[in-house]
Amino acid sequence: MKVDLNADAGESYGAFAYGHDREIFPLVSSANLACGFHGGSPGRILEAVRLAKAHGVAVGAHPGFPDLVGFGRREMALSPEEVYADVLYQIGALSAFLKAEGLPLHHVKPHGALYLKACRDRETARAIALAVKAFDPGLPLVVLPGTVYEEEARKAGLRVVLEAFPERAYLRSGQLAPRSMPGSWITDPEEAARRALRMVLEGKVEALDGGEVAVRADTLCIHGDNPNAPEVARAVREALEQAGVEVRAF
């Protein structure tokens, strides 16, 4: 049995520092790098690409809404055409850095509010999927299972990678609990590790609003900008490997 462990990186810009890139890269098998819209100055993106290269980490594009002030976590009312163009632009930007360092683009995973909007808005999901397909129809697209986002990715003929979040709480509906909801974040590394094991080995996890929810996971996400992200990533990876689960890129 195997699973990918991913984290966001390269999101710092100017005087603003986000994440724990140097501590996280040795612990994950893939990374989603900012492309300049929600975060990531050119220098920081290049630095993250070189860190990924040094640690043998697969690199994906992490396009977001054009919202540096809100770190891409505020929804924006963009048309499907705007989403398509923005995603295509950002994939291309990261690809330039990867080409310069002799690395391939491994996957695409939208960031923050763009990801969440795609999960419930079919036109946004379709625009993302078509942008990825236009750039490279062989590129995998990371999605939340059971959403219109997954459906549109499959309709576009893309390779779909199903994602789960051991340090985020789920609702019975299968959706992630809103960040504003008490208990929506799992901050204890050991609890996150326990949840990761259930997700991978049992295909389910307890829901914040009671009961359990089915989970399908090709990759597990650790949010790199959380204060204790390295500790969570380390605990999750160690628990998986001790259970005989191989951690490697999809």
From Swiss-Prot:
One of its GO terms (molecular function) is ATP binding. It is an enzyme of class 3 (hydrolase). Pfam families: LamB_YcsF. Its EC number is 3.5.2.9. Keywords: ATP-binding, Hydrolase, Nucleotide-binding, Plasmid. GO terms for biological process: carbohydrate metabolic process. It catalyses: 5-oxo-L-proline + ATP + 2 H2O = L-glutamate + ADP + phosphate + H(+). Gene3D superfamilies: Glycoside hydrolase/deacetylase (3.20.20.370). The keyword Zinc-finger does not apply. InterPro entries: Glyco_hydro/deAcase_b/a-brl (IPR011330), LamB/YcsF/PxpA-like (IPR005501). Catalyzes the cleavage of 5-oxoproline to form L-glutamate coupled to the hydrolysis of ATP to ADP and inorganic phosphate. Forms a complex composed of PxpA, PxpB and PxpC. Belongs to the LamB/PxpA family. This is 5-oxoprolinase subunit A. It comes from Thermus thermophilus (strain ATCC 27634 / DSM 579 / HB8). The gene is pxpA.
